[in-house]
Amino acid sequence: MEELDVDPAETPIPGLGQQNRHIGFSWGPGDLLLYETLYQKQGNSETAARCPFMYLVRSDEDIYSPVLRKLFNESHSIFVGLQKSAEEASGKSRKAQLVQVSRNYRSVLRACMEEMHTLSESTRETAQKYISQISILSAMELSWNLCEILFIESAPAGPLLILLLEWVRLHVCEVDNIVQDVLRSEKPTEHEKFWDGVTGYVLQGRMNEARQLLAKEASTSASARSMCRVLDDLLKKMPMLHTGGTQTLTEFELKWQHWREECERHLQNGTFSSNVHMEAVCRVLLGDEEVLLEKRDLMTTWYHFLVSRLLFKHPTVKPTELHFYAQSSLDMFLAGDSCPEPLDNILLAAFEFDIHQVIKEFSIVSSNWWFVAHLTDLLDHCQLFQAHNLYFGANMREFLLLDYASGLFSHHSLWQLGVDYFDYCPNLGREYLKLHMERIPLSTEKKALKALRICEQRQMTEQVRSICKTMAMQSLCNRRLGSALSWSIRAKDAAFATLISDRFLKEYCERGNFTDLDLIDNLGSAMLLSDRLTFLGKYREFHRMYSQEQFSEAASLLLSLMTARIAPCSFWLTLLLDALPLLEQKQVIFSAEQTYELMRCLEDRMAAKLESTSPDEIQKQDSSIDNTKVEMLRLALARNLARAIVTEGALQE
């Protein structure tokens, strides 16, 4: 897209920058962190107090609105449904489907507006905030509806005006309020705005309602009855095109010309000369621009003026002619008294069929990417953006969806919606998703499991490992060793699994028992991730065998753990001490050969300890508890060796 031709909006931050220091910043997903640095600006040698605050600036506050969150959630399901149905329909059925999708989006917008209306009436404190949001949503729905008519329905001459009339009736409702006030009064025909109601209905092409109101005037005034009858007849006879009708444009134009001549004849004959209100209505029917402009207060907007002008002057307007009438109607309506608003520029761009300008203008004025992302996606399905690629490889649809989804990832729950938007961005969506998944704050295990499932479904191996490592570290910091071990196994992180296994063994040495037995008992093939984890699993298996009095199997396993040297050096003595109850059993458990192995392991342990200990520390440790345990082991091993030799000798004889 082109460079912006407007200056970006400034956001003043109270208190920031008052100390004449340089400002530091750090970007986050949807946020900007600002703070004052220690560095003073040039030319300022005065010392000033440091600002004790940091400021978090959010680029999109809308995602924190409870009502707008409903908009994001419901439009997400519409978006996903549209993507899934992209290949299912074609031709006329596809067009009807796209029109229905567009109406679904608009119905969600209108539901949000209605809810905000209710909230603004019930809460005074935040009423202004809701009114502002209603104004933005109203502009979105107005613009979307026009784009639906011009780009999706692609209505030809004739049906085009019918759709534009429906558009105006839906979005300009002042005449309904006027008529309600009139009908509530005791004498409606004497109400000061009675004729405003009649004229307002006529300006919107609502001839039946205008005739019903006019009938009240005819019933109360005998002098005006004949004029009312003539005006009613003109309103009744006004030719109107209908969607799906069989009437050709040529036939319609012929009828419309005859009807117009009849209106002009009554005006020239002075049929309504005694009633200025009826005469004004007749002039409106003839499309008198001067009278139409006099009624601008009833229309309130230039686009209502445009549609009314077309209704009475050029009802068979072609789509290619709209931009001329739109620009001239805007100029006539404003009459140089004011400048066009941003919404006016958006609507003008739509009437010029410049969809890129519509997207650009709304991107400038909107506080979020919801409107432009979803509208662009819908129009892309209408194949209106095929040739508009951006320089970095993504088309405009993908660019806007990526930005919208990135904004969703800054919210603690809406980030899950953003995943699907990335999924339907074929060029860069996967890479964006990888980056965002690595930066999600994993505040709870439930959230981590959701993130993990998303990454596993998309075979994002590195992100799976990153999430598991993060959760393993969090669990370790919270002293939840079982959870930490489980996460490290899922991450297939051998080093971290070794670290946690060491923590389990250390805890066992301190307490004399294991925590999280269910996890350790069911490690299965996961224990092969690291030697230390294998040792932990097998060591727990030794304890289980011992508790089940499978002494021979327990002894063999214990000996294999010692000879395999996969236990940490600090744990060797604990292993040897675990052999003591087996050595003291009435039945000989360890054979002579196994006892020699145990003795060798004990001496190796003592030798390793001597190598790593200074002479002064050796003297201090001579009377330590460890020394006593070693002597007990040596004595038990010697006794067991003697018993084993005797037993084995007796068996040989």
UniProtKB/Swiss-Prot annotation:
A UniProt-annotated Pfam family: Nucleopor_Nup85
BP terms from Gene Ontology: mRNA export from nucleus; nephron development; positive regulation of DNA-templated transcription; protein import into nucleus
The keyword Protein transport is assigned to this record: yes
GO molecular function: structural constituent of nuclear pore
Keyword set, alphabetical order: Membrane, mRNA transport, Nuclear pore complex, Nucleus, Protein transport, Translocation, Transport
Keyword Chaperone: no
Compartment annotation: Nucleus, Nuclear pore complex; Nucleus membrane
Gene Ontology cellular component terms for the protein in this record: cytosol; nuclear membrane; nuclear pore outer ring
InterPro entries reported for this sequence: Nucleoporin_Nup85
Family: Belongs to the nucleoporin Nup85 family.
Subunit annotation: Component of the nuclear pore complex (NPC).
Described function: Component of the nuclear pore complex (NPC) that seems to be required for NPC assembly and maintenance. Involved in nephrogenesis.
Name of the protein in question: Nuclear pore complex protein Nup85
